[in-house]
Amino acid sequence: MNKVVLYCRPGFEKECAAEITDKAARREVFGFARVKENAGYVVFECYQPDDADKLVRELPFSSLIFARQMFVAGELLRDLPPEDRISPISGMLQGVVEKGGDLRVEVADTNESKELMKFCRKLTVPLRAALREVGVLTNYETPKRPVVHVFFIAPGCCYTGYSYTTNNSPFYMGIPRLRFPSDAPSRSTLKLEEAFHVFIPADEWDERLANGMHAVDLGACPGGWTYQLVKRNMWVASVDNGPMAQSLMDTGQVTWLREDGFRYRPTRNNITWMVCDMVEKPAKVAALMATWLVNGWCRETIFNLKLPMKKRYEEVSQNLAYIQEQLNAQGINAEIQARQLYHDREEVTVHVRRWWAAVGGRRDER
């Protein structure tokens, strides 16, 4: 198996392809990406047969911006016989995967592919039983073993392969299933909720999204992102010239500051979270975020970068590199991650967690 299949948002196949080609080459894995416009996936074909496994093992999935999922795959199975689709799939996986811990029968996130969802659900149970019988799957689900993927791109056509639970998306199709809360002021609230799921391990939520924390929301109106912070019982300074939803103001946890988010400067030094979803050029937002981080005005931040029409991967890479350079210049350690979330559109969401350097009034964190 010498291919890596990557799921992505339809319309962003070129960005996904540019990213995997670039980051694979940095690890001395060379190949070429097969791209079909608006397909919702990319196939990166490695020149060396073992390099696909190397890539899926060693390239941190968390470092990918435009991919929702990645797995090692073999040749495309075509024209599966309607009377027996299971045998060719089972045959393709035998000798490749031994005792996988989970099975995901998936499709791309397109309207055309979604018509196959009912079929995928129907196929999953008998396919799981057949794969257990031949040892491709264990007799019980376990997160300690590889995930077996069967990815249908059309009726009777699928890629088969595997990913590692330590380096993949835990979500079916790479998409967290979130429900829009009826009392939220806007649908943008789902962006921040998804970002929490993607960037913060579930076992760290109680510590890093704790009751009583202080947070700032830049460009907050009408309050979709503030809602997520209030929901976690934080005290929020919501900065925007536009009004906040009255339901949020009634909680008593929100202070509305009628100011421009780019001009606002915090007056307290115990802010844990700063979040920002402003419609502005990405370079301008990146510069503002770097200012907050370098000055130690917050401990963690989640913000959106709106994407241009062309060279979107290059633009995001430049913005992230700028933030990293500003932090490096001050000797500040930080963890930077970016992802085009399911609820994002022409944008990517960035998370930065700062590890405190020597700034007055701060304790050192290692």
From Swiss-Prot:
This is Ribosomal RNA large subunit methyltransferase M. Pfam families: FtsJ, RlmM_FDX, RLMM_N. It comes from the Bacteria. S-adenosyl-L-methionine binds at S188, C221, P222, G223, G224, D240, D260, D277. GO terms for biological process: methylation; rRNA processing. GO terms for cellular component: cytoplasm. Monomer. Its main location: cytoplasm. Catalyzes the 2'-O-methylation at nucleotide C2498 in 23S rRNA. GO terms for molecular function: S-adenosylmethionine-dependent methyltransferase activity. Belongs to the class I-like SAM-binding methyltransferase superfamily. RNA methyltransferase RlmE family. RlmM subfamily. It is found in: Cytoplasm. It catalyses: cytidine(2498) in 23S rRNA + S-adenosyl-L-methionine = 2'-O-methylcytidine(2498) in 23S rRNA + S-adenosyl-L-homocysteine + H(+). InterPro entries: RlmM_FDX, RlmM_THUMP-like, RNA_MeTrfase_FtsJ_dom, rRNA_MeTrfase_M, SAM-dependent_MTases_sf. Gene3D superfamilies: 3.30.2300.20, 3.30.70.2810, Vaccinia Virus protein VP39 (3.40.50.150). The keyword S-adenosyl-L-methionine applies. SUPFAM superfamilies: S-adenosyl-L-methionine-dependent methyltransferases. The active site is at K306 (proton acceptor). Its EC number is 2.1.1.186. Keywords: Cytoplasm, Methyltransferase, rRNA processing, S-adenosyl-L-methionine, Transferase.
